[in-house]
Amino acid sequence: MNERAEEEELRRKLRLIRLLHQTNPYPQGPGTASQRRNRRRRWKQRWRQLVALADKIYTFPDPPADSPLEQTIQHLQGLTIQELPDPPTNLPESSESIDSSQRLAEI
């Protein structure tokens, strides 16, 4: 199963690289010599960029299967929301509100 997954990942990368190469066809068409030369020069520059990008795609390492992020996601997916009890209707006055009112009186 692991070899099959690796093979499928390699095929996906190769399809992406092939798509990149198909988006940059060799320039065709009429024009003066300088226009044709400039089109070829721009095409060659784009081609070098595509080759560099394809190399990065091909050599980019795959993330490990049990990365901390995936473990965290699996843990979060296991969480459920439980029904909480109704809050109490009469709350005692908190000590923080007493402290803040005493401080205001001192100022």
Swiss-Prot record:
Annotated stretches, region: Homomultimerization: 16-24
A Pfam family it matches: REV
Region (Disordered): 20-40, 82-107
Annotated localization: Host nucleus, Host nucleolus; Host cytoplasm
Main subcellular location: host cell
BP GO terms, sorted: mRNA transport
Motif (Nuclear export signal and binding to XPO1): 71-82
Keyword set, alphabetical order: AIDS, Host cytoplasm, Host nucleus, mRNA transport, RNA-binding, Transport
Record's GO cellular component terms: host cell cytoplasm; host cell nucleolus
Domain of life: Viruses
Short motif (Nuclear localization signal and RNA-binding (RRE)): ranges: 35-49
This protein's record includes keyword Repressor: no
Composition skew (Polar residues), residue ranges: 21-34, 91-107
One Gene Ontology term of the molecular function aspect: RNA binding
Assembly information from the UniProt record: Homomultimer; when bound to the RRE. Multimeric assembly is essential for activity.
Domain text: The RNA-binding motif binds to the RRE, a stem-and-loop structure present in incompletely spliced viral pre-mRNAs. This region also contains the NLS which mediates nuclear localization. These overlapping functions prevent Rev bound to RRE from undesirable return to the nucleus. When Rev binds the RRE, the NLS becomes masked while the NES remains accessible.
Function, as annotated: Escorts unspliced or incompletely spliced viral pre-mRNAs (late transcripts) out of the nucleus of infected cells. These pre-mRNAs carry a recognition sequence called Rev responsive element (RRE) located in the env gene, that is not present in fully spliced viral mRNAs (early transcripts). This function is essential since most viral proteins are translated from unspliced or partially spliced pre-mRNAs which cannot exit the nucleus by the pathway used by fully processed cellular mRNAs.
Protein name stated in the entry: Protein Rev
Organism: Human immunodeficiency virus type 2 subtype A (isolate ST) (HIV-2)
